[in-house]
Amino acid sequence: MLQILNNANDKIQYKLNDFSDLTPSFKIKSGFFTIHRINYEKLEENEEEKPRQISAFDIETNGREIFFGVYDGSEYKYVIIRKPEDVKNALDLLTEETYFYGDYDLPVSLANYVLLGKHSKFAKKITGENYFTTKNLRIKRYKNFYKILYNGRSINSINLLQFYSESLYEAYSRYYTKLQEMGFQVFDEQTMKEWKEDKEKRANFDKLDFNDPKTIQEIARYNKLDVIATYQLALLKNSLFGIKVKSTLPRTAITYIISQVQSEFVKGLRSYTEIELTLKRLYKGGLFDSNELGKFKKVYKYDVNSMYPFMMSWLPELELVETQKGFEVNEEPLLKGTQFNEDAKYVYIYKITLKQDRKYVASKANGMLLRMMYNRGSFFDFELADEKHELIPDIKIVGQYYTMKFKITKHRIFKDVIYNLYNKRLQLKKEKNPLEKVYKLILNSSYGKFGERIGFNAKFQNVIYASMITALGRTFIQNVDPNAISYLTDSVISKAPIKSELVGDQLGQLKQEGVGEAIVIGNGQYILNDPQEKMIKLRGFNVDESIAEKIIEYVGNYLAKGKIVRVQIPTKIMIRNLQQYKILAEKDSNVLMGMLSNQIKIFTPLNTKQRYTYNVHWFGSMFRDEQEHKEYRKTWEKYIETIEPIDLNSILS
């Protein structure tokens, strides 16, 4: 049943500043790797983009029914979804471009649709939330974006959280003044206060009766505030970013960045089996690893300022010169240790097997990024270099090898646009301007678009650039301190201060975040007792900081004695999709879709990225190869199950 709660008395007035007279058009050819030039053409004065009708929606659920509220700028309406047919009524309210806030609303609605209708034959398809279809409904999921085809209509449903990266209330508060300046009818002070209080009280929804008119009226009151806030922020984002906003933030960022670059990017690539095999194995993630674990009297923690944007600023224009079944050392690599070389003439990509006697190069194996004695895969030349050598003496090339040789035809093609964005962000940060966050989001979201859908002809996909950015990051951060305690993607925890010339507030320099005693019990799991600010991180567990501190101290004290303990940690898990639901429902029949579920997670220190042995500290060593790692992981998992977990309450008491 469709119910209209009320109509807005006054249509919200808004205006969008036109920051650019450029409209992108893409030339897409068949091919495997090429980033194609993006041509920009000015709009004629009498040309206008076709306006799109925009709406926003938000849901509330008790795990059985769904309250689905929608606002289109003039009217707020809602539907209560009790059976599959009601989903159609909800979709009828949506416009061709609609926004939701967070990774909750649409996935939960779709999963509940499957459960309500018992669409068992479609459940497998929607489990991964990538593709879902029934007779009259088709949904394709991308990251932060859904394409819905329903009843002859095409609806783009966009997760607005990606453009703000904080809670809805925080984002609305941050840009409250900006919304006023844009002419929006913003919430008054009393409404803001009530909205905040409502959000803090939202709990135990599974107890709510969606058949009670009074309950529905109360739900509608704050659901309406959510959807109006989402709607206003959706319209505001174009003006905030000052550039043409696309359906996702990474696409928005990379479209803008590429539009500022005059380059052909990568030239000379052709479809060839050996090339494809080499480049498919090239992409790896950041270095997230620990060489030592335990208690330390004094450590230094540093973060690289915007590490990936900085590495992106070093990307060159490349032209493939030759491929060969041989190995040739590049005597002038782009990076040696932490020193970049703007006079480098070539970039080599190798498909090789190498033997290393110390931890340098990382390879993907068994679903992890491992530094093993024998590494097989694809590598850049600079990954094999350090401050003094083009090929580290501890690295030997063994087995078959293949080399792709690229000529650098233009250096640092993204430098100007990256530095302009970064410097603008620094200036706004000094001014305490909330728009500072916008520039941070653009910088941090841009690099990943290069690596999307490797192996497909995506508009911005380029495996070489995506791989080079992360490889430069891994190589740089490890060479900051080859003997560091931990590497945390763009951070390093060391026993001694790093070189002073690497420290500063400029792009790519390292900022000292803390100094003091530390307990490190796993990757991203530590306490650092800096006199100015105690840092407590327990990656993978959403618990209060005070509880995390006690867990780390307890486990760390045992590790310091050479003993391993495990801890049972009660945690609340939000059931957002069918995959989670299926797993948890097997253990607990009371699990409800879209609701918090009380679960027990077990914390185990150490990890299987390295083989740890105890000698005052726990020291990590490399595995010989991926087979040895696979066998070790099986043995470790069997062993760790013999250690009975300790109840968290016994630690807290």
From Swiss-Prot:
Replicates viral genomic DNA. Pfam families: DNA_pol_B_2 (PF03175). SUPFAM superfamilies: DNA/RNA polymerases, Ribonuclease H-like. Belongs to the DNA polymerase type-B family. The keyword Nucleotidyltransferase applies. InterPro entries: DNA-dir_DNA_pol_B, DNA-dir_DNA_pol_B_mt/vir, DNA/RNA_pol_sf, DNA_pol_palm_dom_sf, RNaseH-like_sf. GO terms for biological process: DNA replication; viral DNA genome replication. Its EC number is 2.7.7.7. This is DNA polymerase. Keywords: DNA replication, DNA-binding, DNA-directed DNA polymerase, Nucleotidyltransferase, Transferase, Viral DNA replication. It catalyses: DNA(n) + a 2'-deoxyribonucleoside 5'-triphosphate = DNA(n+1) + diphosphate. It comes from Acidianus bottle-shaped virus (isolate Italy/Pozzuoli) (ABV). The keyword Metal-binding does not apply. GO terms for molecular function: DNA binding; DNA-directed DNA polymerase activity; nucleotide binding. Transmembrane segments: none annotated.
